[in-house]
Swiss-Prot record:
It catalyses: a lipid X + a UDP-2-N,3-O-bis[(3R)-3-hydroxyacyl]-alpha-D-glucosamine = a lipid A disaccharide + UDP + H(+). Belongs to the LpxB family. PANTHER family: LIPID-A-DISACCHARIDE SYNTHASE (PTHR30372), LIPID-A-DISACCHARIDE SYNTHASE, MITOCHONDRIAL-RELATED (PTHR30372:SF4). This is Lipid-A-disaccharide synthase. Its EC number is 2.4.1.182.
Amino acid sequence: MAFQLTPLRVALVAGEPSGDLLGASLLGGLHARLPASSRYYGIGGPRMSAVEFDAHWPMEKLAVRGYVEALKHIPEILRIRGELKRQLLAEPPDAFVGIDAPDFNFGLEQALRGAGIPTIHFVCPSIWAWRGGRIKKIVKAVDHMLCLFPFEPELLEKAGVAATFVGHPLADEIPLEPDTHGARIALGLPGGGPVIAVLPGSRRSEIELIGPTFFDAMELMQQREPGVRFVVPAATPALRALLQPLVDAHPSLSVTLTEGRAQVAMTAADAILVKSGTVTLEAALLKKPMVISYKVPWLTGQIMRRQGYLPYVGLPNILAGRFVVPELLQHFATPDALADATLTQLRDDANRRALADIFTDMHLALRQNTAQRAAEAVAHVIDSRKPR
């Protein structure tokens, strides 16, 4: 790093919990790689704030899911983006890192890049999964892309965007062999007997849409597999309060409702019923059979269906390039279908062994010391812009 008279300043924006995780990992690497006097600020969540990050706005302001659902929040989101843009243009940082949240970050990155501020984007949008458009935005907005998956840099470099594969921090964090017995002890679950983890989402809207269906499926599973126990982790106290009435409405269920501890809950499980998202990758890294599902409002679903061209939405299937675990989406996500598919995943030992091999290969491919690799790439971009 060239000699620096004033502290380096790196602005970062994360818009949802998965971005907060990535941001915290990156910040850990930056603290080790850049001068100790460097400052980090912008928009982030609690994990980023815990590693010396100054959050000018809380991440929750941007955490809105779905096309239709976002409409009512657009004025405030645009106001925040406009104010942040004015601040960053008035006092330019040495680099800007947008962490996922492409709808928010790309417009901001394009404006900053136009003003000569180096722009880095962490998490390549799914240009390989969705039709058209976004690659053009990336070319205009991004100086360097940090990619979680190994096949992404080649796609970007063909379009003229510099990119680095950095792996996924979850692959660094999660052990290659999960301690199922230890996780059951931590949750107060019996060591024997089947356990299914059920994760209906990390947002109120997700739980309201699919939570009742998941609990009805749990009721059917317990009827068909009487010894089964369920563990349902709630991401926050507010979401636990939202889930509690569903637990109360199914008094015969053997269910443990936890606050946080999603990874422990999945580690304790023999099979997982999970709403699509980053958590499906976490389940794969834990080597667990699973069923992936989601429900979104009808119009949002229609828009997503028309934009997508991959036949799958779950990260385990995307990374494998084929269906290795079942997906039941929208109107296919009925209690009966979910119960049947999840119990099949629970009972099929040959499938369990095959998935363990597939998921171990994924784990090894993604285990790249992400914090160090990502921080090194950011430092290289900053250093390449500094006068010698």
